Amino acid sequence: MTKLLFMGTPDFSATVLKGILADGKYDVLAVVTQPDRAVGRKKEIKMTPVKEVALENNIPVYQPEKLSGSPELEQLMTLGADGIVTAAFGQFLPTKLLESVGFAINVHASLLPKYRGGAPIHYAIINGEKEAGVTIMEMVAKMDAGDMVSKASVEITDEDNVGTMFDRLAVVGRDLLLDTLPGYLSGDIKPIPQNEEEVSFSPNISPDEERIDWNKSSRDIFNHVRGMYPWPVAHTLLEGNRFKLYEVTMSEGKGSPGQVIAKTKNSLTVATGDGAIELKSVQPAGKPRMDIKDFLNGVGRNLEIGDKFGE
C-alpha cells in the first residue's frame, strides 16, 4: 500500500482526502493543514475541513503556521512516506521535503498553465471563461509550475459562482486523482511540461479587487459579483459606506455608471458602463444580508433615482 502525506485545508481538499481514504489503495500517514482560525462575528475557533476528516479517521494532524523551518517538517520527514498529495494547502512545500519522497503531486483547480496561484476559480469566473478544470501536476519549488500528469475540464455557466464551481471541481479533482494515480505510479502516464508562453496567474484576491468598478460592462460586473461569491464578496460604496453585492442580474437601461436608474418596491436597477444591472441580494453596512425587496422596504427606502453607488 502506497504511504502518503496529505496536505490541504478547505472543503475542496476534504473532498479529495475522503476519496483517497475510501479508495483503499493508500495509507495516509499524516495530514498537514492550516492552523485553526477564529471565524465569524463571534470569532469562534474552527477546525479546517481537512482536520475534521483526519480526526474522524484517526489520522495524525500537523498544523504549522509555516511548514518551512518548523519542527513539524522534521517530524514529517521521519514518517517514511512514499509520496505527497496536496490540494489547496495554502503554503509552499520546502524543497527538502519534496526531495525526501518518491513523488509529490498537487490537485490544482485550473487548466494549467492558465491560472497558477491561489484563486484560480475566482479569476476564471471574473474573466468570463467558458470552462474551468482541474490539473494533476507534479510539485516543484516554483508555484504551480510542475509537469502536468492529467487534466479534466468543466463548463462554467451563468448560474455558476465560486461556491458551485468549488463543489463541482472538488469532485472532479477527487475522481481525476484516483483515476490518475495508479498509472502515474506505475510509469504508464508520462507527465507533460507546461507551455511557459501560455502561463497566467491568479493570486489571492486583494481587498481592492473586491470593489465594483461601475464603468465596466454589465457582463463584467455580473461576472465580478459571481467571481466573488460566496467569498470574499464584491462590494461598492453607498453614501460613503461599504455595501456588499451577493447577487445581481444583467439588465437594460442607460445612465451614469453607478447611478440608480429604476426603482420599484421589489427591484433596483443601477447603470453600468454599457447598460445596467439589477441588484438581487445585498448587505448594507452594519446589517445582515437581505434580498433587495427587504432592503428597499427598510434601510434603502429613501434611495432615489439618480443616487449613486460607488461614492
UniProtKB/Swiss-Prot annotation:
Q: Which GO terms describe its cellular component?
A: cytosol
Top enzyme class? transferase
Q: What is its EC number?
A: 2.1.2.9
Q: Which domain of life is it from?
A: Bacteria
Alphabetized UniProt keyword annotations: Protein biosynthesis, Transferase
SUPFAM superfamilies according to UniProt: FMT C-terminal domain-like, Formyltransferase
The residues listed in the UniProt record as binding (6S)-5,6,7,8-tetrahydrofolate, with positions renumbered to this chain, are 110-113
Identify a single GO molecular function assigned to this protein. methionyl-tRNA formyltransferase activity
What PROSITE patterns has UniProt attached to this entry? GART
Recorded catalytic reaction(s): these are: L-methionyl-tRNA(fMet) + (6R)-10-formyltetrahydrofolate = N-formyl-L-methionyl-tRNA(fMet) + (6S)-5,6,7,8-tetrahydrofolate + H(+)
A matching Pfam family: Formyl_trans_C
> What this chain does, per the record?
Attaches a formyl group to the free amino group of methionyl-tRNA(fMet). The formyl group appears to play a dual role in the initiator identity of N-formylmethionyl-tRNA by promoting its recognition by IF2 and preventing the misappropriation of this tRNA by the elongation apparatus.
Q: Which family does it belong to?
A: Belongs to the Fmt family.
HAMAP family with a match to the protein in the record? Formyl_trans (MF_00182)
The protein's name: Methionyl-tRNA formyltransferase
Q: Which species is this record about?
A: Streptococcus agalactiae serotype V (strain ATCC BAA-611 / 2603 V/R)
